[in-house]
Regions:
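Short, non-ligating residues that shape and space the ligands of small metal-coordination modules
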Residues: 62-63
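Bacterial N-terminal signal peptides
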Residues: 18-28
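Short Fe-S-cluster ligation motifs
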Residues: 83-104
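Short, cysteine/histidine-rich loop/knuckle motifs that typically chelate Zn2+
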Residues: 55
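N-terminal secretory signal peptides that target proteins for export/translocation
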Residues: 1-15
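Sec/Tat signal peptide C-region and signal peptidase I cleavage site
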Residues: 31-35
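Non-transmembrane alpha-helical segments in soluble domains
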Residues: 45, 87, 91, 137-144
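Flexible coil segments in periplasmic/lumen-exposed cytochrome c-class electron-transfer proteins
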Residues: 36-40, 50-51, 59, 97-174
Length: 174
């Protein structure tokens, strides 16, 4: 007796429905991921502002410092550092270059730049502020998404940076 084969219970409509649901699930995950990334970018911007990063690097991280007496920070739009190196630079600072260390565990508890734990270098610029690993990660996310590899500041970028105060700050972004 031959085996009887039958059409799937829901036919072509069922297959299309399953495909549509699969696409919807992928889009929902993508949207949630985008929202989380956007939240980390905003958190990173908040840390960037509250930590005084723009004093040396400029509001848009282009090396145009905001205070004359501050050390001149690198133009992070042109950096070729990977995320791990950016994070280590924030955590450990740049001895001799004016970049302070923002990591509470830098040098003493956790070595920096391949060195074992020990005293901080004498030529490390002092910082009264420390950042958590999560805050440093948020700053790196912000820099990677909004700064690194970008050219001139666009009006949209300026508006995202300044938010509600954009109209008074974005007439001629740098």
């Amino acid at each position: 007796m031959p085996l009887k084969t039958s059409e799937p219970q829901y036919g072509k409509f069922g297959a299309r429905l399953c495909a549509a649901l699969a696409v919807a699930a992928v889009l929902a995950c993508s949207t949630a991921s985008h929202a989380q990334d956007e939240a980390k970018q905003k958190a990173g911007l908040s840390v960037w502002r509250s930590s005084g990063c723009s004093e040396c690097h400029g509001a848009f991280a282009n090396g145009e410092k905001e205070r004359d007496e501050a050390p001149t920070g690198a133009n992070l739009r042109q950096t070729r550092l990977d995320d791990a190196t950016i994070a280590e630079t924030i955590r450990c600072g740049r001895p001799g270059a004016g970049m302070p260390s923002f990591g509470a565990d830098a040098y003493k508890e956790r070595g920096c730049y391949g060195q074992p734990p020990g005293p901080a270098p004498d030529d490390l610029y002092p910082s009264a502020l420390t950042l958590s690993a999560a805050q440093i990660s948020d700053v790196v996310t912000y820099l990677r998404a909004r700064i690194v590899g970008k050219r001139a500041v666009t009006p949209e970028e300026c508006a995202w940076y300044y938010g509600e105060q954009a109209s008074s700050n974005c007439d001629a972004p740098k």
